[in-house]
Amino acid sequence: MIAALFSVSVVVAALGYFVDIYDLILFSIVRVQSLKAIGLDGQELLDKGVLLLNMQMAGMLLGGIIWGILGDRKGRVKILFGSIFLYSLANTANGFVNSIGAYALCRFIAGIGLAGELGAGVTLVIEELPREFRGYGTMVVATVGVTGAILANFVAKHFDWRVAYFIGGGLGLLLLFLRIRIYESRMFLSVEEQGISRGNFISLFTNKKRFFKYLHSILIGLPIWYCVGILITFSPEFARALSVRGPVSAGEAVMSCYFGLVFGDFGSGYLSQQLKSRKKVVLAFLLLATLIVALYFRLNNVTSSIFYFCCFAMGFAVGYWAIFVTIAAEQFGTNLRATVASTAPNFIRGTVVPITFFFKIATNYFGILTGGAIVGMVCITIAFYSLYRLEETFHKDLNYIEE
C-alpha cells in the first residue's frame, strides 16, 4: 500500500494541488498590499479586488470545462502538466504587473490554469490505484494540497508580494521536471484505442438521469463553499455582530479554517477507507458541519481565540473536499470522468457568487446573523438531499464507459 500511495502519479498530483492552493490563497492574502503597490487606494481596493476575484473565477469556470474535455480526449497526464505550466507562467507574470488591466489578465489566465489541476490529478490517481486504495490516494492529494495555504500565508508574511508570486510560479515549473516519470492511465489508453467518443460535455445535459447525477455530485459540496465563502471570508463582520472580544481578521480566520481542512481531508479520506463507504463519511461530516455552523452563530461575547478555534473546527467539518471530488469522478465512466472531475469542483467554487448574492439579500432583510443562518440552512439541506440521491461508489469498478 505504501508503494502505491507514494507512486509518482500520487506525488505529482499532490504537489500540483499544493501549488494550486498556494496560488488560490496567495491572491486573497496579498490583494491589498499588491493593489496599493500599483497605485490604488480607498474604495478602489475593494472594487478592483472584487474585479480580480471575478476574473479569476471566470477563468476557473471556463478552464474547468476546457481542461475536463481535453482530459478525456487527450489524456490525464497532458492536462495535469498543461494546467501546471499555464498557471505557473501566469503566476510569474503576475509578479511583474504594474496596472490593474495586466493584473486582471494574469488572474484570468491563472484561473484557467488552476481549474485543471485537481480534476486531472484525482482522475489519474483513482484510475491507477487499486479500488481498495483509491480513497487513500485522494486523501494524500487533498491533505498535501491544502497545506499550500499555510505556505502561502508564511511566504506572504516574510516576502514582498511580487516575490511571493515568483515563488509560486517557480514551484509549478519545478514540478514539470517530474513529467518524464509519470505514465498515462491504462483505463484511458484502453478507451482511446477503441475510438470511443470522449469528453462530450454536452452529453451531461442531454440525458435526464446523467444530468441529475452530475448535479447532485456538485451540490453535495455546497456547505464547503458556504462556510469558506461566507462564514470565514466575512468573519470580521460576523465577529462584530457577535460581540467577539478582541480583533478578528479574515486572514487569521482563513488560516485557521485551512489548518482544519488539512485534518478534515485526512480524516475523511481515512474514514472512507475504514468504513468502506464514501456516502457514510460525507453524511457524518455534513452532520458535524451542521453542528459547528449552529455553534458559530452562538459565539456571543467569546474571545477571538475561541472564535478562531471554531473556524478551525469548521474547516475540519467541511474537510470532505477530496471525497467530494472522488465521488464525482467515480460516478461516471472513463470517457467522461475527467470532464466531471474537472468541472464539478470549479462549478461548486462558482456557487460562491449566487450564495453571496442571496446572503446579501437575506442580510438586508434579516440582518447578518439571521440572514447568514438562513442561507446556511438552505445550502446544507440541499447537500443532504443530493447525497441521498447519489449511489455509493467505494466498491465500484471504474473500467467502463458512459453510453
Model-identified regions with their sequence ranges:
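Cytoplasmic membrane-interface "Motif A"-like loop-to-helix N-cap segments
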Residues: R73-S83, E132, Q273-L286
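Conserved MFS/SLC helix-loop-helix module at the cytosolic interface between two early adjacent transmembrane helices
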Residues: L62-N98
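Helix-to-loop junctions at the C-terminal end of transmembrane segments
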Residues: G64-G75, D265-S277
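Helix-breaking motifs and short loop linkers at transmembrane-helix boundaries and internal kinks
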Residues: G75, F96-A102, P130, K276, ...
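Extracellular/periplasmic helix-loop-helix junction of adjacent transmembrane segments
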Residues: V30-L62
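Extracytoplasmic gate region of multi-pass secondary transporters
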Residues: S28, R210-D265, V352-T356
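Helix-loop-helix hairpin linking two adjacent transmembrane segments in secondary transporters
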Residues: V141-I180
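Cytoplasmic helix-loop-helix junction between adjacent transmembrane helices
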Residues: C106-T143
